[in-house]
Amino acid sequence: MDSDPAFTQLAIAKGVPWYVEFFQRFDRLFTFGANIGTQASDIPVGAFTWHKTWQPITLDDWRAAPAPGGPSTSLGPGRFSTVMTWQIESFTDVGGNKDIEFVKFIDLPSQTRQPFELAINGPQKLLREHGWETVDAMKVSRTPWEYREFIHRSKAEFGVAKHTYVANHTGWFSDRTECYLASGRPALVQDTGWTAHLPSGEGLLAFSNPDEAVAGIERINADYDRHARSAAEIAREHFDASRLLPRLLEISCS
């Protein structure tokens, strides 16, 4: 299961023997990059066939009480949040980490009254200087229950993607975002090409630049309850394990 589309394929394309041999051991390969191996992305796949999938979610484990911030008539105290890594330690020869994209949106807190909270292992001082509230990512993700609690106390997700996902139009969609949606939390996330495969506009919104991000925040806050309901419905329709696993097994056993 490839959760880092483009990074994985680009590393294979470099032809490092042990890495290529590792993937040759498998009968079927799956990826979270919905555009990998299609004309929508120029990432090379070589002799490998990658099957598109989303991360299966057990919805009962993510049901939550209404989000902080109350009804959609006001901003309320709830925060748009995410859990993120500024730069990954793997694939250092590929590059294209999240920091490259995030700096494009670093002044977002000054463009909206909406509060933000980042759980991040990155330059917290720099981010706080630009108006982001920050906590240590490890502190909120040591256990599945702490991770879930952080998401449940959030109003919505604001998520930026790694530069490699965006630049190569991979169609990557985050399993973290799935958890927000399954919790009934709307998600405003950067477009990597996933909008060709998933609904966008209610509950799940895409952005590609700061103006679109601000507009998305305003749309969610203008009718929060509707977006929260739509978020949960998208999770049921597209990420429910009872729907995804049969197809995974069918492809794996074919």
Segment roles from a protein language model:
Residues 97-101, 139-142, 212, 223, ...:
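Soluble or luminal CAZymes and related metallo-dependent hydrolases
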Residues 2-175, 179, 186, 190-201:
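Nucleotide-sugar donor-binding catalytic core of glycosyltransferases
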Residues 222-252:
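A charged, aromatic-enriched C-terminal amphipathic alpha-helix characteristic of glycosyltransferases
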Residues 188, 198, 206, 210, ...:
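Conserved catalytic or regulatory cores that recognize and/or transform ribose-phosphate-containing ligands
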Residues 76, 205-226:
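C-terminal "capping" alpha-helix adjacent to the active site of nucleotide-linked donor transferases
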